[in-house]
């Protein structure tokens, strides 16, 4: 088995809330990505609203999509 590729973790600000727990997030480098909530955040009912500062994991294969893994306080 091959070693799983490492995800790129970066910070951003939620700009827009979309249906089905999808969000438009502006990263620190001003790029806009489409991100969904991670499973643990869904399980624990963590709410995300526009303006929240979040940590996003990006796949090294597709840098336009990501997963929100943490919401800053």
Swiss-Prot record:
InterPro entries attached to this UniProt entry: NA-bd_OB-fold (IPR012340), RNA-binding_domain_S1_IF1 (IPR006196), S1_domain (IPR003029), TIF_IF1 (IPR004368)
GO cellular component: cytosol
Span of domain S1-like: 1-73
Keywords on record: Cytoplasm, Initiation factor, Protein biosynthesis, RNA-binding, rRNA-binding
Main subcellular location of this protein, as a coarse class: cytoplasm
UniProt cross-references to Pfam families, sorted A to Z: eIF-1a
Protein localization: Cytoplasm
Recorded GO MF terms: ribosome binding; rRNA binding; translation initiation factor activity
SUPFAM superfamilies: Nucleic acid-binding proteins (SSF50249)
Function noted in UniProt: One of the essential components for the initiation of protein synthesis. Stabilizes the binding of IF-2 and IF-3 on the 30S subunit to which N-formylmethionyl-tRNA(fMet) subsequently binds. Helps modulate mRNA selection, yielding the 30S pre-initiation complex (PIC). Upon addition of the 50S ribosomal subunit IF-1, IF-2 and IF-3 are released leaving the mature 70S translation initiation complex.
Record HAMAP family: IF_1
Family of the protein in this entry: Belongs to the IF-1 family.
Subunit architecture: Component of the 30S ribosomal translation pre-initiation complex which assembles on the 30S ribosome in the order IF-2 and IF-3, IF-1 and N-formylmethionyl-tRNA(fMet); mRNA recruitment can occur at any time during PIC assembly.
Official protein name in the record: Translation initiation factor IF-1
Lineage of the organism: Bacteria, Pseudomonadati, Spirochaetota, Spirochaetia, Spirochaetales
Gene: infA
């Amino acid at each position: 088995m091959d070693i799983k590729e490492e995800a790129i973790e970066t910070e951003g600000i939620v700009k827009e809330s979309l249906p089905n727990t999808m969000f438009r997030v502006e990263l620190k480098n001003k790029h806009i990505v489409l991100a969904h909530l991670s499973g643990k955040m869904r399980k624990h009912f963590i709410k995300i609203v526009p303006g929240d500062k979040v940590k996003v994991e990006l796949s090294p294969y597709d840098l336009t999509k990501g997963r929100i893994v943490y919401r800053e306080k």
